[in-house]
């Protein structure tokens, strides 16, 4: 059985250097790292990860908790986190909280029990008091798309209210005055903030907000379909819809075409998130950029800096949304 001593002899480096390479320590030159990895490959050496973990008090694993495993938004986020961590020699364990308080708590407990060195969490159902209580845990937790003032240095968040404001203001700038809104679930803080931004834009421009033209739905295509169905049945006039996310927008666009509406001439639509399919819809969806890839990378960099003591560039904790202008809004000016 090959030992670390044989790897050290073949690579002509110290045992400490071999250990640093196996632990992903950045204080090893690329040339030395390649020598050690080549020696390990030649000898067929596989590190005993359990023993390594016990010796270093590190598992080199990071937990990720997201509301859902499926879907373009969280897929992008998880991919960004995993890519950044894998490049540093770390692995991830992923579990889902399904936007349910008990399942989110269970997910965090599971990741802690798996001896993850840190956790990156996108939680929606647990309250701020629970999150504050996690500060006592020895496992550091980074929160994406959640802001808790007392834990600001562990939070990475987006100004969702501003995003909702920009979305509706964009419709207004194109001459739309009768604007409907399909919001996400009002149990979710980002959905609440986006709806608040929509209302602020309407109020600032002196436009009427009709309850019959606001619908609370799931952050899924079905939310968009049901929302547009409700608006059409209300017989209220509207020329545009501000959608809580791109999946809602996609559902609304599908329902509109199925019922003979031409986009954007008969109905203008704006989304939120700028997920990968937004530019492939017809017409191409005008939307609000939610920099989920960058936020995922930032979360991973925070873990590498704070847990693994790897030097990183300055960390950005708060992101501003931006408009991605495409083809789904008709100009009525």
Predicted features along the sequence, with ranges:
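Flexible loop/turn connectors
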Residues: 227-230, 234-333
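Amphipathic helical "hinge" segments at domain boundaries
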Residues: 46-110, 114-118, 196-199
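N-terminal helix-turn-helix DNA-binding module of bacterial transcription factors
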Residues: 1-59, 333
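Hydrophobic alpha-helical segments within soluble ligand-binding/sensing domains
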Residues: 156-181, 196-200, 221-229, 249, ...
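An alpha-beta-alpha
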Residues: 167-207, 212, 315-329
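Short, solvent-exposed amphipathic alpha-helices that sit
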Residues: 35, 73-87, 163-170, 189-208, ...
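Structural motif
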Residues: 92, 96-113, 164-165, 216-234
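Flexible loop/hinge segments that line or gate small-molecule binding clefts
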Residues: 99, 121-166, 174, 187, ...
């Amino acid at each position: 059985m090959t030992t670390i001593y044989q790897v050290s002899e073949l690579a002509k480096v110290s045992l400490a250097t071999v250990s640093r390479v196996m632990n992903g320590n950045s204080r090893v030159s690329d040339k030395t790292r390649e020598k050690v990895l080549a020696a390990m490959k030649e000898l067929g050496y596989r590190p005993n990860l359990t023993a390594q973990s016990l010796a270093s008090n590190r598992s080199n694993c990071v937990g990720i908790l997201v509301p859902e495993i499926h879907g373009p938004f969280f897929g992008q986020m998880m991919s960004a986190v995993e890519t950044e961590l894998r490049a540093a020699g770390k692995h991830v364990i992923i579990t889902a909280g399904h936007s349910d308080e008990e399942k989110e708590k269970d997910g965090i407990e599971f990741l802690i029990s798996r001896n993850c060195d840190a956790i990156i969490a996108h939680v929606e159902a647990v309250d701020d008091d629970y999150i504050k209580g996690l500060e006592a845990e020895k496992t550091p937790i980074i929160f994406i798309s959640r802001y808790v003032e007392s834990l600001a240095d562990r939070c990475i968040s987006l100004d969702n209210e501003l995003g909702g404001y920009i979305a509706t203001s964009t419709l207004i700038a194109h001459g739309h005055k009768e604007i409907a809104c399909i919001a996400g679930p009002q149990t979710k803080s980002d959905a609440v903030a986006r709806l608040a931004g929509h209302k602020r834009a309407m109020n600032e421009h002196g436009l009427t907000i009709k309850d019959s033209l606001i619908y609370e739905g799931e952050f899924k295509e079905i939310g968009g379909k049901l929302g547009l169905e409700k608006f059409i049945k209300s017989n209220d006039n509207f020329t545009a819809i501000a959608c809580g996310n791109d999946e809602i927008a996609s559902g609304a666009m599908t329902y509109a075409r199925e019922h003979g509406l031409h986009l954007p001439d008969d109905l203008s639509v704006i989304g939120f998130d700028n997920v990968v399919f937004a530019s492939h819809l017809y017409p191409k969806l005008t939307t609000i950029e939610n920099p989920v890839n960058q936020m995922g990378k930032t979360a991973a960099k925070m873990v590498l800096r704070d847990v693994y003591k790897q030097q990183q560039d300055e960390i950005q904790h708060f992101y501003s949304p931006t408009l991605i202008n495409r083809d789904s809004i008709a100009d009525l000016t």
